[in-house]
UniProtKB/Swiss-Prot annotation:
Superkingdom assignment: Eukaryota
Native source species: Encephalitozoon cuniculi (strain GB-M1)
Full protein name: Uncharacterized protein ECU08_0270
Length: 392
């Protein structure tokens, strides 16, 4: 059975080339090539070679391709035009060098260098606007790859496995993350989350994603973090949906520290709804349990008896109130924020007590103090040591 041209890859290239030449159905061949050019920009390099190999021995097909290129240039589909521009550039179509997003792509075969780019001015302006919009997220060097990620995710939403298959050859994790970031406000959140859960099985992807997740909308971020926890950390080893001898997402110290740094009280609430309160609370207390340490805790009722005018007593009891949960600490920080308008001396006093109480919990200290710096409670210049017993 003849393989369809849209399935072309390096493995089946020669077979599809031979079958296409033998079929004699030039119109179907042209239509399939046109669809690949417009809808599958990630196949631009291979379809460029395919067109060149077909047209080399078929002058009539080359003439028909010229008409097809003109049809493509007249389309009003902006994303289709940008998709096509990569292949047209590689085929040497004149004028493509003036499009900044393809200008640096080398011409593979100047098969159509006699054709000049004739995109209607209004369509060309819209292409430039869309490209400039994407440039706010990505740099020029990675534009083509990120654009391809975006088009794959949009074009193959009907099947997660098929989408993942098309994304497979894209090796740069940053391009995958950038593409998801561009789409996360407009695409279905659950669809994107399912893609991420699968992509996270690739070692290195989750670290890049978590490092960039602050730039995502908090609603999407909280849902994604909660699903990552449920999928990779919440289950027991015997029930885990993904167990690998070499890498398990959200089990390495790097992944866990980045994950905890991103979690907020709202994240924790969603995590508890999905995974259950017990698993979530255990997760946030694992660090100190593993260290074999305990920190004295006091109830909110006990804390309210504190003399808030005694700064040192207030700071110490506040630490014991929030101890030793990141989410609890940050929640109480919001509740009592009016008492954390501190001058530099008070900031020093707080940091000294904070590290005295929590000095053994490195990740907890780094995350909480980082948040306090972010919230402008603590001057970053005062924070010089996250490792232990003194703040300065």
């Amino acid at each position: 059975m003849q393989l369809p041209i849209p399935r072309i890859n390096s493995t089946n290239y020669q077979r599809i080339l031979m079958e296409t030449k033998q079929s004699g159905d030039r119109e179907k061949t042209i239509e399939d090539i046109k669809n690949v050019i417009l809808l599958m920009p990630h196949k631009s390099p291979i379809v460029t070679n395919f067109i060149s190999d077909l047209a080399r021995d078929d002058a009539a097909l080359k003439d028909r391709m010229v008409r097809t290129i003109n049809e493509i240039l007249e389309t009003g589909d902006i994303h289709g035009l940008i998709s096509a521009s990569f292949t047209l550039r590689r085929l040497g179509v004149g004028g493509t060098e003036n499009l900044w997003w393809v200008g640096k792509i080398p011409v593979v075969n100047p098969l159509f260098d006699g054709i000049d780019l004739a995109i209607p001015s209004d369509s060309l302006d819209k292409c430039r606007e869309e490209a400039e919009r994407m440039l706010e997220t990505v740099d020029e060097e990675s534009f083509e790859e990120v654009f391809c990620v975006v088009q794959i995710i949009k074009g193959f939403r009907f099947s997660v496995p098929e989408c993942l298959s098309q994304l497979g050859p894209i090796s740069r994790h940053k391009s995958l993350v950038d593409g998801i970031r561009i789409l996360h406000r407009e695409e279905n959140s659950l669809y994107l989350c399912v893609l991420v859960l699968e992509l996270a099985k690739k070692q290195g992807f989750l670290k890049i994603l978590l490092e960039d997740l602050d730039s995502f909308d908090h609603e999407f971020r909280d849902l994604l973090l909660s699903l990552l926890f449920e999928c990779f950390h919440s289950p027991g080893e015997e029930n885990s949906v993904y167990i690998s001898s070499s890498y398990t997402p959200l089990r390495t110290p790097e992944d866990l520290e980045l994950f905890k740094h991103l979690t907020t009280e709202n994240t924790a609430r969603i995590m508890k709804r999905i995974s259950g309160r017990g698993k979530v609370e255990k997760f946030f207390h694992e660090e100190e349990a593993a260290a074999g340490k305990e920190v004295l805790r006091i109830s909110r009722e006990e804390f309210e008896k504190t003399d808030f005018g005694d700064k040192k007593m207030f700071f110490r009891n506040f630490c014991l109130l929030g101890s030793p949960s990141i989410s609890h600490f940050l929640t109480y920080l919001e509740i009592y924020k009016e008492h954390f308008v501190l001058d530099k001396e008070d900031q020093k006093a707080f940091l000294s007590i904070f590290f005295e109480v929590f000095g053994g919990f490195e990740s907890f200290c780094r995350i909480v103090v980082g948040k306090m710096v972010q919230f402008k409670i603590i001057d970053p210049e005062l924070v010089t040591d996250f490792d232990g017993n003194q703040a300065l």
